[in-house]
Amino acid sequence: MQLEIQVALNFIISYLYNKLPRRRVNIFGEELERLLKQKYEGHWYPEKPYKGSGFRCIHVGEKVDPVIEQASKESGLDIDDVRGNLPQDLSVWIDPFEVSYQIGEKGPVKVLYVDDSNENGCELDKEIKNSFNPEAQVFMPISDPASSVSSSPSPPFGHSAAVSPTFMPRSTQPLTFTTATFAATKFGSTKMKNSGRSSKVARTSPISLGLNVNVNDLLKQKAISSSMHSLYGLGLGSQQQPQPQPQQPPSQPPPPPPPPQQQQQHQQQQQQQQQQQQQPQQQTSALSPNAKEFIFPNMQGQGSSTNGMFPGDSPLNLSPLQYSNAFNVFAAYGGLNEKSFVDGLNFSLNNIQYSNQQFQPVMAN
């Protein structure tokens, strides 16, 4: 009788776990077991298992069995909560060697426990043996008596009997990861990484887009432009400096020079131009060798366009330019006397030091 009562209790309280306070549900089971033992005293017939089956039946429906009501009061549970969590129209038959139940008036009768030694039990299907509550999926039956933690005692009979199923809450297994699976997850999360990130276009630098900008070339061009502006300012200054002074013409115009002297001046100019053309074109320069495309303004009065070209490899020799400008001035004023013109301007070529003269570079806005 103890074994059959324990099977029926496990089936009933399986509906109450996780819905009502667990401690009170356990007390409800203990009180119900005690009350059922008292009720079945003198009404247990192993020789005739089905005798008194209606008296031993536990019914929960519109009318609740008095044993269920008494156990609810002793455990502190509300009878409405117990009836609301149990199946509607539940009937449990506790008979010797067999425990069965029915849900609903027209529902099928299912067997929870049956003994192998019973002649009627041998005719039943083996799948019915040691069955448990199919509605309560959170409980697992333990068929091994050695590993059973149930408080159900051993069968009181000498022959072998089926062990009552013990129901235990199903514990959630922790997530386990291998090295490969954990590497594919986010740290601190069990969600997999989003593979859509790899489809995003990465930021590209200007070099990868074809905009190859060389900083050294920019610095060289900036230095060349500043030097060109300074040289251009020097050329203009050398041309504009002697111009304000000749505005004060002498009181008496000088007589025209004789023809032999004019011819001598033309010969000197031609010799000077030949010397300039014979000078080597490739010399060391402080400018960048890539600055060959810059053209200086024509600083000579009667020079070709090639004389205005300043080679990148030639040195910054300003002496030929300055002296050529001086001779061009004489060529423009061919009718003036050289001595009186120089004395009027107070212009001395020996006093000017071109190598030591410091110039202020002119920066263009």
Swiss-Prot record:
Parts forming coiled coils: none
One Gene Ontology term, aspect cellular component: CCR4-NOT complex
Short motif Nuclear export signal, span: 228-236
Regions of compositional bias (Low complexity) in chain numbering: 144-160, 262-283
Region (Disordered): 144-171, 233-287
SMART domains: btg1
UniProt motif Bipartite nuclear localization signal: location: 22-39
PANTHER family documented for this protein: PROTEIN TOB1, TRANSDUCER OF ERBB2 TOB
Protein's job: Anti-proliferative protein; the function is mediated by association with deadenylase subunits of the CCR4-NOT complex. Mediates CPEB3-accelerated mRNA deadenylation by binding to CPEB3 and recruiting CNOT7 which leads to target mRNA deadenylation and decay.
Name under which the protein is recorded: Protein Tob1
